[in-house]
Amino acid sequence: MADPAECNIKVVCRVRPMNATEQNTSHICTKFISEEQVQIGGKLNMFDRIFKPNTTQEEVYNKAARQIVKDVLDGYNGTIFAYGQTSSGKTFTMEGVMGNPQYMGIIPRIVQDIFNHIYQMDESLEFHIKVSYFEIYMDRIRDLLDVSKTNLSVHEDKNRVPFVKGATERFASSPEEVMDVIEEGKSNRHIAVTNMNEHSSRSHSIFLIQVKQENMETKKKLSGKLYLVDLAGSEKVSKTGAEGTVLDEAKNINKSLSALGNVISALADGKKSHIPYRDSKMTRILQESLGGNARTTIVICCSPSSFNESESKSTLMFGQRAKTIKNTVTVNMELTAEEWRNRYEKEKEKNGRLKAQLLILENELQRWRAGESVPVKEQGNKNDEILKEMMKPKQMTVHVSEEEKNKWEEEKVKLYEQLDEKDSEIDNQSRLTEKLKQQMLEQEELLSSMQRDYELLQSQMGRLEAENAAAKEEAKEVLQALEEMAVNYDEKSKEVEDKNRMNETLSEEVNEKMTALHTTSTELQKLQELEQHQRRRITEMMASLLKDLGEIGTALGGNAADMKPNVENIEKVDEEFTMARLFVSKMKTEVKTMSQRCKILEASNAENETKIRTSEDELDSCRMTIQQHEAKMKSLSENIRETEGKKRHLEDSLDMLNEEIVKLRAAEEIRLTDQEDKKREEEDKMQSATEMQASMSEQMESHRDAHQKQLANLRTEINEKEHQMEELKDVNQRMTLQHEKLQLDYEKLKIEEAEKAAKLRELSQQFDRREQAKQDLKGLEETVAKELQTLHNLRKLFVSDLQNRVKKALEGGDRDDDSGGSQAQKQKISFLENNLEQLTKVHKQLVRDNADLRCELPKLERRLRATSERVKALEMSLKETKEGAMRDRKRYQQEVDRIREAVRQRNFAKRGSSAQIAKAIRAGHPPPSPGGSTGIRGGGYSGIRGGGSPVIRPPSHGSPEPISHNNSFEKSLNPNDAENMEKKANKRLPKLPPGGNKLTESDIAAMKARSKARNNTPGKAPLTTSGEQGS
């Protein structure tokens, strides 16, 4: 480690241009004094650099971030992060527009600059670059390169430096690979739309670049980390209009930014002993960047609008506080064995000097305690010559000969060599233990995930069975209810038919009675005219009779006042007739009102019919969508079957290719053994060949049996999964059929209910008509009773008058006329009495019918309520079955996706056990072409990590490109079985070059050279497997 040095955090301020809405609604509140000073609201703020709105992306990068690239490549840690309110330009500053040279942000430019610096450095340097990309969303660390890792934790290494455990790390050897990683992470990042920003970042993103370099000549190793942080902006809910999930995100963003502000304030204060790094995961990760071992640059982004003046002021205050923080930076350097040796020698010499000085001081102290005064010259703290003299005798007392000295030097060199070997062994063992720990953790995580998947499957199966049983019970209940409704419907239809017949008969009778009433009314009018004529005659006759009686009374001396009551009775009859006329006019008005009510009811009935038609159209559209979804499901199932057939075909072809590879290996082994036997022993040639053939046949049989078992197990598993998928499809089809049946029953019930409602409306209208007719008949009864009473009184008066007149009259002509008038009046009165009797009978019949209908009306209303409730229940059950069918479809799709993901993860796990290639980059070379090999040194091999087998290449002249045959084979086998088979094969079989099925002359020459080298050095085993190479 180099000596530590202090440096302040560099703070630059960037002010973005105003957008269209701000230009229309506000004004500019910022004033640029110089390149280091800006004024907002009358307050002056100073920073390392001020970027105006017209500053380009390149200028921002050159002034703010370019120097950090050189620092990171020199072994320092670096951090660049953007801070500011929402929609202030942070993401544009950090990322910009990818692929656009003019609008690229700091991250893509810094990536390109790192590689440009590497290509211009000394050729003896070798670089390894790793990148990782994660975000802090809702106070959880989420890996943007592996979305399944949603809650990563922060740990500390042996030097107490925080790091994110479990984050995906990708090796990169070119800027294009790093940009691909950035694009992949950006596609997984959380964004949302607010009132202030259409692409508002809802999380803090951290892009980490780790650079390790090694000088191949001096073995000097340096490492540096570069954190590129895009913070989410602070938000005011009143301005952004956040609701729901966006509001929760804003709360977490403001909370983490508040924790960052608290850390900055505590560091700027300088008096606080506790720095609250652990209040937020973001501050925990950036602990080294804030007051630790890193060169940090903060880009504070502001808005020039007066609408955001308060937020801009708080952002500038944050920058002012951060500018006062000091970091202690050191070079991250791994010392070599020679450097550690030199340090050890220096410390040893220093220790010896301190021990000698300690002895001098102890002697001086003993003399002082004994009461002796020590002269100034002999005091230890002022006489360095005494220290030298005490150290010299130790060196002079030892007499060493040259031979012994040479021996000791040789032993010393050997010990140092052994120390170096032990150090390398310790490093290898530590790496191996770390790899094994990582593999154990991965296996445990895989096992726990498989257990969770199994438990989820068990719970889902139990829930599906329970839902299936509940659906069956519901279907039974629905069928029973439908049967009951059908029976009730038959009964009601019969009752309705009977009522319709009765209503028709009643309506016919009412029509007849109405016609009779019309005839009676016309006859009454005629009678009234006749009665008026008779009244006139009667009044004239009465007047003449009264005159005669008066004359007779005067002659006899009597009084004629007794005849006046007859005249009063005649006047009462006139009043009754006027009352009847008024009642007839009242009935006309009521008939008009009834006709208006009928029209209103007909209009409402037409509206209800239109509503029913619209609902039927909606049902037809829902059926069409259901049929379309079923067709899609059929097409998807057919695609799955086709892919499975293709998969089986590829597996068969893979088996054939593996058998051919084994045969070729066997043939090559036989050829090699033949050549060796010709050189050594020509006599035992046939015997060794037969033994080799027997061993190879046994190996081929064992390989074939193991492979067949593996394939059989995999095929059985695939068949079981297919069987489960078919069962789920059958269940889905049954549910769809039940859904269709319920839909049809629901439509039938709806039609029946519409018909019943129409009939009920007709019955209610008829009932209203009957009520009105009853009221009308009541009035008629009263008027007819009054008329009958008046007619009865008139009849008595006429009879009495006629008797008196017959007794008193003397002339025959008058008697004949009066008798004729009385007979005509009697006939009319008898006709009216007959009509009244018929009307009373009709009235009584109507009253009886009304009473019967009133008794039946509550029953019909109860039945109607029951049917309406049942229809509602059926609608709810239909809705629930629809939702259940949708849930089943979603569950089925999720199950299919889960099975696919499990297969993909299994294949990925098998591939993950293979080698992870750490791509080394040699400095001083131009960037490699996309199609060539990247970062290859020392004979054309890439640096290999993990447990994968290396690729053995023939000499470069005339050799074809290597083709990997083992990827697909490893997919069909378990990793352990594949490794065992490979080890067994490597014990006896040589490695074939991956150049194809045919051996070239260069391949044969290379194999002969390897066999000779193997024979010459029997003590050393060849590096054939990855495990041997790793050890």
From Swiss-Prot:
PANTHER family: CENTROMERE PROTEIN E, KINESIN HEAVY CHAIN ISOFORM X1. Residues 673-692, 906-1031 are annotated as: Disordered. One of its GO terms (molecular function) is microtubule binding. Keywords: ATP-binding, Coiled coil, Cytoplasm, Cytoskeleton, Microtubule, Motor protein, Nucleotide-binding. Composed of three structural domains: a large globular N-terminal domain which is responsible for the motor activity of kinesin (it hydrolyzes ATP and binds microtubule), a central alpha-helical coiled coil domain that mediates the heavy chain dimerization; and a small globular C-terminal domain which interacts with other proteins (such as the kinesin light chains), vesicles and membranous organelles. It comes from Strongylocentrotus purpuratus (Purple sea urchin). The lineage of its organism: Eukaryota, Metazoa, Echinodermata, Eleutherozoa, Echinozoa. It comes from the Eukaryota. Belongs to the TRAFAC class myosin-kinesin ATPase superfamily. Kinesin family. Kinesin subfamily. InterPro entries: Kinesin-like_fam, Kinesin_motor_CS, Kinesin_motor_dom, Kinesin_motor_dom_sf, P-loop_NTPase. Residues 393-857 form a coiled coil. CDD domains: Khc_CBD_cc, KISc_KHC_KIF5. It is found in: Cytoplasm, Cytoskeleton. Pfam families: Kinesin. Residues 858-1031 are annotated as: Globular. Kinesin is a microtubule-associated force-producing protein that may play a role in organelle transport. ATP binds at residues 84-91. This is Kinesin heavy chain. Oligomer composed of two heavy chains and two light chains. Residues 932-949 have a biased composition (Gly residues). One of its GO terms (cellular component) is dendrite cytoplasm. Residues 8-325 form the Kinesin motor domain. One of its GO terms (biological process) is synaptic vesicle transport.
